[in-house]
């Protein structure tokens, strides 16, 4: 009875609930880069995502995964796309973001950042990265 009452109040007060999923510095060893040795040796890449999506009542009121997106499914999609070699981080970030928006219909927008650890750029730098925003 109480859950029914809460659901009625929630439905009256909100038409749509949005949420942001944060995945910070997902670490993956991958083979991306302009130089041939980068595609042979590989490097550590760190993917950070801020994903805005619509959350349904099942997740908020019923504690049911069916009302949102599984973090594990997001990570799996990122891993799949990161396994395909690219020369440019810009191209890679676009591909990963596009895959997520394509795979998960509840995603409204996302911000993606991909950092490459110790890139071969002639200077001592911890990482170089690219950020990109995408809207459905």
Q: Model-found features: residue ranges?
A:
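N-terminal, polar/charged subdomain of small-to-medium soluble alpha/beta proteins
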Residues: 9-136
């Amino acid at each position: 009875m109480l859950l029914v009452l809460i659901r009625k109040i929630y439905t009256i007060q909100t038409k749509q609930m949005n949420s942001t999923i944060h995945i910070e510095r997902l670490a993956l060893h991958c083979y991306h880069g302009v130089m041939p040795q980068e595609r042979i040796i590989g490097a550590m890449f760190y993917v950070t995502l801020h994903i805005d999506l619509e959350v349904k009542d099942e997740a908020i009121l019923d504690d049911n995964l069916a009302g949102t997106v599984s973090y594990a499914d997001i990570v799996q999609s990122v891993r799949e796309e990161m396994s395909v070699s690219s020369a440019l981080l810009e191209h890679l970030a676009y591909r990963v973001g596009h895959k997520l928006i394509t795979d998960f219909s509840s995603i409204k927008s996302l911000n993606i950042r991909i950092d490459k650890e110790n890139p071969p750029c002639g200077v001592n730098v911890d990482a170089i990265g690219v950020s990109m925003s995408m809207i459905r």
